[in-house]
Amino acid sequence: MDMHCKADPFSAMHRHGGVNQLGGVFVNGRPLPDVVRQRIVELAHQGVRPCDISRQLRVSHGCVSKILGRYYETGSIKPGVIGGSKPKVATPKVVDKIAEYKRQNPTMFAWEIRDRLLAEGICDNDTVPSVSSINRIIRTKVQQPFHPTPDGAGTGVTAPGHTIVPSTASPPVSSASNDPVGSYSINGILGIPRSNGEKRKREEVEVYTDPAHIRGGGGLHLVWTLRDVSEGSVPNGDSQSGVDSLRKHLRADTFTQQQLEALDRVFERPSYPDVFQASEHIKSEQGNEYSLPALTPGLDEVKSSLSASANPELGSNVSGTQTYPVVTGRDMTSTTLPGYPPHVPPTGQGSYPTSTLAGMVPGSEFSGNPYSHPQYTAYNEAWRFSNPALLSSPYYYSAAPRGSAPAAAAYDRH
C-alpha cells in the first residue's frame, strides 16, 4: 500500500521532468513551488548556509542562490513570468517622467533616471524599466526623428532631452531650384524672406590681366556679372547708384601701369626657379646702399694687395728646400713656415709695417722692474732676467700683443 502511495521518481521524467544530482525532482521549464521558495528564505534567515539549504531541500545550489539573490535585491520570492514577454513597463506615465527628467537635465544618464524613478515612487522594483529600456525610450520616444510635414513644419533631432517646437509663423524655405544661390545663404537656411528693399546686390567681378592688352596701355580688362540687382543698376545703365556701388567695389582692384608691368614680368618667368636669377629679387631701393663712392676705398685696398701679390720678385724670397734656419727679426719676411703662405708686406720691402712696429718697444725698457705694483715688489729680483744681454736686440715684442707667460728661467732656479 505504501509502495503505491510513494511517488515514482521516474514519473516526473515522463512529464518533461527529471531528477537532479541531489535526488530532488524538478520539471523542466516550470518554477520551483512557492512552498520550497518560502522554506529556502526561512532557512536563510536562520543563518543556514546556501550549500546546506541545497542539501537539505535537495534543490540545486544555483536555484537556491538565484532565489536568495532576487529576494535580497527586490524582497520578492515570486518567480518570473512563464512564457511570453515581461509586462510593459514603459507606460505613458513613465515615458512622460523620463522626458521630463531629460528636459530638466539633458546630461542625465539612464541609471540616474532609473534611480530617480525609484526614489520618487513612480515605479517599484518590479515595474522599473531597465537601463537599456530607458535608453530605448529616450531614443525612440523622447527624441523624435525629423519628419517634415506637407506644410513645412516638422520636428528635428537635437541633443538628448531637447525638442524642437514646430513654428508655423516662419514661411517654408525656398527650394534650391528657385534660388540656387540664396538657398545656401543664412536667410535661405533659416527661411527668412528678403524684401525688395533689402535685397542684396552681388557683383561678381572677374579681374584678369591680358599681356597684349596691358602692353597696349589699356590697363585691366574687367568682366562683371550682376545678379539679383534691381532693374536699371547695370554699370552702363541710367541708375547712378549701381554705378557708384560697382565703382567702390572696383576701386581696390585698380593698379598702376608700373604695377601691371611688374606683374607681367613675374608671370612671364618660367615655372621653375633659376639660381642665376637670384639677384633679381633684390629691390631697386636697396641699390643705394652699395653705391660706387662707398665701395671705392675697399676696391683700392684690394687692388693694392693684388698688385703686391703679383710681384714676380716674391718668388725669390720663398725657400725651395724647405729649410727653417734661425733668423733675426729683420729677415722674417723672407722665410716661409710649412703649411702657411709667405708673409707679404704691403710695401713690398723686407721690413715690418708701421702697424707691427707700433706693437714693439725698445729692449732697454725691460731692464727696469718687471712689476711696479706694491704686492709684487718682493718678486722683482726673482723674476729678473739673469742675462740682460738677451734683451739687447733693437726691438722686442711687448707683452701686451704677445700675451706670453713669464720666462722659464725663473722656474729653473727653484
From Swiss-Prot:
N-terminal signal peptide: none
Q: Name one GO cellular component term.
A: nucleoplasm
Q: Which domain of life is it from?
A: Eukaryota
Compartments it resides in: Nucleus
User: Which keywords, in A-to-Z order, does the entry hold?
Assistant: Developmental protein, Differentiation, DNA-binding, Nucleus, Paired box, Phosphoprotein, Transcription, Transcription regulation
- Taking the first listed entry, what is the main subcellular location of this protein, grouped into a coarse class? nucleus
| Tissues and organs where the protein is expressed, per its UniProt entry | Kidney and nephrogenic rests.
Annotated region described as PAI subdomain, given as residue ranges? 18-74
Which PROSITE patterns does this UniProt record tie to the protein?
A: PAIRED_1, PAIRED_2
Q: Which GO terms describe its biological process?
A: brain morphogenesis; branching involved in ureteric bud morphogenesis; camera-type eye development; cell fate determination; cellular response to glucose stimulus; cellular response to mechanical stimulus; cellular response to retinoic acid; central nervous system development
Q: Drop me one GO molecular function for this one.
A: C2H2 zinc finger domain binding
List the Pfam families.
Answer: PAX, Pax2_C
Give the protein's biological function.
Answer: Transcription factor that may have a role in kidney cell differentiation.
Question: In its UniProt record, what illness is this protein linked to?
Answer: Defects in Pax2 are a cause of developmental defects of the kidney, brain, ear and eye.
Protein name listed in UniProt: Paired box protein Pax-2
Provide the species name.
Mus musculus (Mouse)
Taxonomy of origin reads: Eukaryota, Metazoa, Chordata, Craniata, Vertebrata
